[in-house]
Regions:
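N-terminal helix-rich module
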Residues: 1, 9-39, 43, 47, ...
Length: 181
């Protein structure tokens, strides 16, 4: 009877902690995958001296979806004619399927296509050509410990450099054009 009591207490404490750990790992994995693809896209653009595009492609369907969600998958490809669409003469560099779990994304631009020029900069015609991506799950901006938010905010400067923001107060701040999770 005592053993059952100890097991029940251990499960009561351990199960929620395990669920939080699993959710944190899913968020970290998804964020790392997306940032790796952004780095690969910029690197390929610089290396090949041509436009490289990262666009939403649901489950690796092979075609960019205007207004699509990066949460459903994305493709990085050498965009020889810089039209944001995968053509026969374009080279696919990377494909990623849908994000695991109930992760969703938010972006500051439509269409969601991110085009890196031969100089590695973003091909956005705007006074301040920054791009922002936010990854969220059902926990929103909840503090997961040490003031780290459950969600993530990726800032991409006009120069094509990425910065990952994890601090809860920064994600919820006025600096975040997506307004937090």
């Amino acid at each position: 009877m005592v053993v059952l009591g100890v097991v029940a207490i251990a499960l009561g404490i351990g199960a929620p902690l395990f669920a939080t750990l699993a959710a944190n790992n899913r968020m970290s994995s998804a964020t790392n995958d997306l940032v790796s693809s952004l780095i690969a896209a910029r690197s390929e653009a610089l290396k090949r001296q041509v436009t490289v595009t990262l666009c939403p492609t649901p489950d690796g369907a092979g075609a960019c979806v205007a207004g699509g969600s990066l949460g459903s998958g994305w493709t990085v490809f050498v965009d020889r004619n810089a039209d944001g669409a995968i053509s026969a003469d374009d080279v696919v560099v990377q494909q990623h399927g849908a994000l695991e779990g109930d992760l969703r994304d938010g972006v500051t631009a439509t269409p969601v296509d991110l085009m890196f020029t031969a100089a590695g900069t973003l091909a956005i015609d705007a006074p301040r050509p920054d791009f922002h991506i936010q990854l969220c799950d059902q926990r929103g901006d909840a503090d997961t410990g040490a003031d780290i938010a459950a969600g993530r905010w990726i800032q991409i400067s006009g120069l094509g450099r990425q910065q990952l923001v994890r601090a809860r107060l920064d994600i919820q701040s006025d600096r975040n054009p997506l307004g937090g999770c």
